[in-house]
Amino acid sequence: MKINILTLFPKMFDGFLSESIIARAIKFGAVEVNIIDIRDYCFDKHKQADDMPFGGGNGMVMKPEPLFLALENVSGKVIYTSPQGKIFNQEIAKELVKEEELTIIAGHYEGVDERVVENKVDMELSIGDFVLTGGEIAAMAISDTIIRLLPDVIKKESYENDSFYNGLLDYPHYTRPAEYKDLKVPEVLLSGNHKKIDEWRLKESLRRTYLRRRELIENRELTKLEKKLLDEIKKEEV
C-alpha cells in the first residue's frame, strides 16, 4: 500500500515515520508513506501556499494551484482532513485498507480553497468534534489506523480485540505481578481455562461498552451469549 500525505509541515511526520509499528511496517515493505511538501509546488519567490479569503474574514486559505499541481503527481482515493468531514472510525479504516493507494491532504489555516474540495477530494474525514491547528495530526491518526490493519503489520488477533474493531470497546488488560499493593488480577485470568477467560473478556467488553458507549450496544445485533451476559451486567450495575 502507498499513502501520500500533502502537508505544509513535513517535519511534523519525522517521529511518526521513524518509530514503533509504523517504522517497522515501512521497513519490511508493507506500506510506503510519501510525505509531499505542498510548497514544492509553489513557484513564486516566497513559496506562498496561502492567501487572504475572498469576501474578507479572519485567517488565510490554502491556495488551489499548489494542491492541484501536487495532486497531478499522485493517484488513488483523495482524502481531505476537515472538521466538516465524516467522523473517521474503524469501519471506514477497514474499507480504506483495501485501497492500493491513498492521498491525504492535511488542511491548515482556515482550510483549502473549495475548488480543490469540489474537484479533487473523494472523501472529507474528521477525527472528532474539535479543532486542531492543522490536519497533520489527523493525517497521522488516519494513517496509523489503516497501516496497523495491513497484513503482517501486527498479529490479526491483536487488532481484532481492539476497541471498535468488532463494534465493542476493549476489555481490561492486566500483566505481572498478579498482586500489587493489595490490588489483585481477576482470578479467572489466572485459571488457565480459556473458555472462561474468553467469556470474561466478552462480558467485560460488553460492560465497558454498555457503561461508556451505550449507543454501540443499541446498534448491535447481539448473539445469544451476548444477550445473556448483558442481562447479567444490567443486574450487576443497578
UniProtKB/Swiss-Prot annotation:
One of its GO terms (molecular function) is tRNA (guanine(37)-N1)-methyltransferase activity. Its EC number is 2.1.1.228. InterPro entries: Alpha/beta_knot_MTases, tRNA_m1G_MeTrfase_C_sf, tRNA_m1G_MeTrfase_TrmD, tRNA_m1G_MTases_N, tRNA_MeTrfase_TRMD/TRM10. GO terms for biological process: tRNA N1-guanine methylation. GO terms for cellular component: cytosol. Keywords: Cytoplasm, Methyltransferase, S-adenosyl-L-methionine, Transferase, tRNA processing. The keyword Glycoprotein does not apply. It is an enzyme of class 2 (transferase). The keyword Transferase applies. It is found in: Cytoplasm. It catalyses: guanosine(37) in tRNA + S-adenosyl-L-methionine = N(1)-methylguanosine(37) in tRNA + S-adenosyl-L-homocysteine + H(+). Coiled coil: none annotated. Its main location: cytoplasm. S-adenosyl-L-methionine binds at G107, I127, G128, D129, F130, V131, L132. NCBIfam families: PRK00026.1, trmD. Homodimer. Belongs to the RNA methyltransferase TrmD family. Specifically methylates guanosine-37 in various tRNAs. This is tRNA (guanine-N(1)-)-methyltransferase. It comes from Fusobacterium nucleatum subsp. nucleatum (strain ATCC 25586 / DSM 15643 / BCRC 10681 / CIP 101130 / JCM 8532 / KCTC 2640 / LMG 13131 / VPI 4355). The lineage of its organism: Bacteria, Fusobacteriati, Fusobacteriota, Fusobacteriia, Fusobacteriales.
